[in-house]
Each structure stands twice: as C-alpha cells, then as structure tokens.
A protein has these predicted regions:
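Short, solvent-exposed loop/turn and secondary-structure capping segments
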Residues: 7-10, 119-121
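Flexible, glycine-rich phosphate/dinucleotide-binding loops
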Residues: 4, 115, 142
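Conserved loop-alpha-helix segment in the C-terminal half of the alpha/beta-hydrolase fold
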Residues: 96-139
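Non-transmembrane alpha-helical segments in soluble domains
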Residues: 45-49, 125, 152, 156, ...
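Glycine-rich, phosphate-binding/catalytic loops in enzymes
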Residues: 11-17, 123-127
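Active-site nucleophile loop of the alpha/beta-hydrolase fold
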Residues: 1-7
Length: 165
C-alpha cells in the first residue's frame, strides 16, 4: 500500500473478523507491552497469519527460513510492536500523492485475504501512469504461494505485455 495510515486502518478491518476472545487476548498482550510473550505468536499464527499472511496448511521452506532470519528489532522499529496498526517509524509514511509521478509500467497485486487492502492496491494501479492491477482472489499477503496459478499467470502476462506499455 502507498500509505501506512491506510494500512493501519485496514488492519482494523481484519481485526474485526477475528474471534473477539482471541482479539481481546492479543490486545491485552499489546497493551501490556508483552508481544515478546510466546503466547502472542501462539495467537497470531493460527488466527491472523494463517488467514492473511500465508494460507497454506504447511508453509514452504523459504517462508519458514525467512521468518527464522527476520530481524524483529528492525521490523518493530519500522512497523511497531502490533500487527494491528502502525506505530513505528513508518506510522506517518504516505506516498499516495507521488504515485502519478511513476511513469514506468507498474503492476500492483492484491489478494482476497491479504493484510493489504486489495481495493487500495487496485486504486494504486489507477494513479500511476501505466498501471495494471492483478487480483488473486484466493491469495493472502504471500499470494505467490497460496494463489500461485493466478499470481504467476498474471505476472507472466504482465511481463509479456510490457512492450505495449
């Protein structure tokens, strides 16, 4: 998304879809600055990540490897400690007004279950001069894995059509 504040607002839309009991426990951990508590990830993985980050029953090895090497300190510094809103250094980051300055072909990709608002991703494609939007209806944030056919066919088609842009 081109706006961290908009991303934060959309995370609240996703939060409202969660089991209220689970969300309340997540919010309590966040309110107590206890996101390092293993219980936080025990709640996030099945109730948020498995719904909006990666929708496969078993995550591919490269995804697991990425999480193993994720720099949590930097992630938290940029995003903030919560998956529901942005309070880190990117909290006010917003580049929506700059999108029309992009003159190269741009492919924005949204997914039906993404952590990023697919409507915002589609909107972005209309703001750049040579934008195309690809929607992966069954995908999540990692649609390249969990809606692979739509994702790969869409990216390949977009690349093949670049000469026309």
């Amino acid at each position: 998304m081109a706006s961290a504040p908009d991303y934060g607002k959309y995370s609240e839309v996703l939060a409202k879809k969660m089991d209220p009991v689970v969300l309340a426990e997540i919010r309590a951990l966040e309110a107590n600055n206890d996101v390092a508590n293993p219980r936080y990830m025990e709640l996030l993985i099945p109730n948020f990540y498995n719904q909006h980050l990666m929708r496969l029953p078993e995550w591919p090895e490269p995804v697991n490897r990425m999480f193993k090497h994720l720099n949590g300190e930097i992630y938290t510094m940029m995003q903030g400690p919560s998956e529901f809103g942005i309070s880190g250094r990117l909290s006010k980051w917003d580049r929506k007004a700059d999108l029309p300055q992009l003159t190269l072909p741009v492919l924005t990709i949204g997914a039906g279950n993404d952590t990023m608002d697919p409507k915002h991703m589609e909107w972005m494609s209309t703001r750049v001069r040579k934008g195309t939007y690809l929607h992966c209806p069954e995908g999540s944030h990692m649609a390249m894995w969990d809606d692979q056919k739509v994702y790969m066919e869409g990216v390949i088609s977009w690349i093949k059509n670049l000469d026309g842009k």
